């Protein structure tokens, strides 16, 4: 995405006497036309000179806290260790410019924020320098910012940032605050101290599972063991009389057991028996799913993914074929799924990759509008795509709404493994033709597997479709009509090799098993398949060369 500095929409206001800068990450014109499409992050400098940054891309171990602060601190000329940060709440202004949702995923946090975040720091720096120029009578180009101070060209400290904030907040925002050259970087590419390590070591970091426990009940859910098949009946008589049990109620996902603490809820859950319907699909075991994928590869009706070059006109010296299969995979985040919901204040404490979706699912469970819900996002004990799906938030909201009091819902590790939104299974069949000089004169790749994006849209639909349908959902829905799912074929489509003829095609095979995004998405399986087959081709060429010698 290209964003010029002049298209960098700036708003400035006095907030408690401080300097607050809003800055857009959106494409040109979007912010002015509709604020809901203009993602905003906020840099605030208090009258005391404290720099506060809202982290709108969640921290789940990948370093976004450090990355975001480093970009701003580089241009603002402050020590990143002195910057205070807060996890951003839900706001349309924080929506990702590529996804149109307030979501962290796709490895784009630094890519889409690199220049806008630097611009925010540079703009604040320029305003502080201008304020210093007015107070000192010295030209601004003879002043420079260093470690929260403004100094003259001879190195003399003239002002601290705190002394300039009020005056700076009254200035017009410069249209084109200059960015530093790469040669002048002091932090970018050099600063390697993780700013989230200390709180994680000393225990002050708050994860979703660390939500406040005052007057909070704990819930676990007993679920049907096969997929998400519907429950038909349950027997809770043995569980109801166990110590600490508060309530046992049926929700959409199964039976929620609510108790005074997690252990009592879990022990009571073990005493409940369920009856459930198997569902309509026969594809509920590995053998049946594998057979369906094989049948799809044996058939036709493939959607073309990439077709380049001409098929070879001459016979190949050698033809190689291979078939690869990859299974469902659970994310197995270190921190199990959890969410705490207060139905009275309509607050949610959760570690989520998608705060706005969490608010929508909580609203669905509480039967309120999403804008009435406040999400307190926390550190994530692993995300990997799993925490973009807020099913556990819906469960917690349904239980809290039924009881009328705050509830913390916690999954077990077994829940996490059995009821994940899994990486989809995929089967690939590849065929390559080698020429006389060991060149690949034809590459054919057929893929069969479920549509990850269609499954994701279906899972999100209950909460998001009634009130709004983001453009990306509409686009992907249309994409599915053509039976091509880019999220399932990436890594196979973007083949990096200059083969003479490339033919890649995909066939959608739906299964009833819930699917979700995995780190690297389609590359997770397709990179393995493509590179393994390239290795097989290289091995075949090596053997041919050795034999010829």
Language-model-detected regions and their locations in the chain:
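Thioester-forming pentapeptide GCGEQ
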Residues: 549
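Structural alpha/beta core scaffold segments of enzyme domains
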Residues: 1-546
């Amino acid at each position: 995405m290209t964003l010029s500095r002049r298209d960098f929409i700036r708003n400035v206001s006095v907030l408690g006497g401080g300097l607050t800068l809003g800055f857009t990450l959106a494409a040109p014109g979007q912010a002015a036309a509709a604020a809901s499409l203009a993602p905003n992050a906020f840099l605030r400098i208090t009258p005391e000179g404290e720099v506060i940054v809202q982290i709108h891309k969640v921290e789940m171990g990948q370093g976004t806290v450090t990355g975001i602060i480093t970009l701003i601190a580089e241009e603002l000329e402050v020590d990143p260790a002195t910057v205070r940060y807060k996890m951003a709440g839900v706001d349309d202004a924080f929506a990702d410019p590529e996804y149109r949702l307030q979501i962290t995923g796709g490895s784009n946090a630094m890519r889409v924020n690199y220049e806008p975040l630097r611009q925010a720091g540079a703009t604040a720096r320029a305003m502080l320098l201008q304020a210093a120029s007015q107070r000192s009578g010295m030209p601004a180009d003879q002043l420079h910012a260093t470690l929260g101070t403004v100094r003259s060209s001879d190195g003399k400290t003239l002002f601290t940032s705190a002394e300039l904030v009020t005056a700076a907040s009254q200035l017009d925002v410069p249209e084109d605050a200059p960015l530093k050259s790469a040669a002048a970087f002091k932090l970018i590419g050099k600063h390697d101290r993780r700013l989230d390590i200390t709180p994680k070591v000393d225990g002050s970091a708050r994860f979703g599972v660390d939500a406040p426990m005052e007057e909070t009940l704990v819930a676990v859910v007993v679920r049907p063991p096969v997929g998400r098949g519907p429950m038909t009946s349950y027997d809770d008589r043995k569980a109801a009389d166990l110590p600490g049990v508060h309530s046992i109620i049926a929700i959409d996902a199964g039976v929620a057991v609510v108790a005074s603490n997690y252990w009592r809820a879990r022990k009571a859950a073990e005493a409940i028996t369920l009856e459930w319907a198997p569902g309509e699909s026969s594809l509920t075991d590995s053998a049946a799913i594998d057979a369906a994928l094989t049948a799809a590869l044996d058939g036709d009706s493939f959607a073309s993914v990439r077709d380049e070059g001409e098929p070879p006109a001459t016979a190949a010296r050698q033809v190689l074929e291979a078939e690869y299969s990859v299974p469902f995979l659970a994310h197995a985040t270190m921190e199990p799924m959890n969410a705490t919901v207060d139905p009275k204040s309509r607050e949610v404490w959760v570690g989520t990759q998608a705060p706005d979706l969490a608010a929508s699912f909580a609203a669905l469970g509480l039967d309120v509008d999403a804008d009435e819900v406040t999400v307190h996002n926390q550190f994530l004990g692993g995300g990997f795509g799993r925490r973009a799906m807020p099913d556990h938030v819906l469960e917690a909201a349904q239980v809290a709404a039924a009881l009328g009091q705050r509830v913390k819902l916690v999954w077990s590790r077994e829940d996490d493994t059995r009821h994940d939104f899994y990486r989809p299974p995929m089967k690939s069949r590849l065929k390559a033709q080698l020429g006389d000089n060991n060149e690949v004169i034809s590459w054919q790749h057929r893929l069969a597997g479920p549509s990850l994006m269609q499954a994701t849209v279906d899972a999100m639909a209950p909460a998001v479709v009634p009130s709004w349908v983001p453009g990306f959902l509409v686009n992907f829905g249309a994409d599915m009509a053509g039976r091509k799912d880019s999220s399932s074929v990436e890594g196979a489509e973007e083949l990096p090799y200059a083969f003479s003829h490339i033919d890649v095609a995909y066939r959608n095979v739906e299964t009833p098993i819930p699917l979700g995004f995995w780190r690297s998405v389609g590359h997770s399986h397709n990179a393995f398949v493509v590179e393994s087959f390239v290795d097989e081709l290289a091995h075949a060429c090596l053997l041919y060369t050795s034999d010829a010698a």
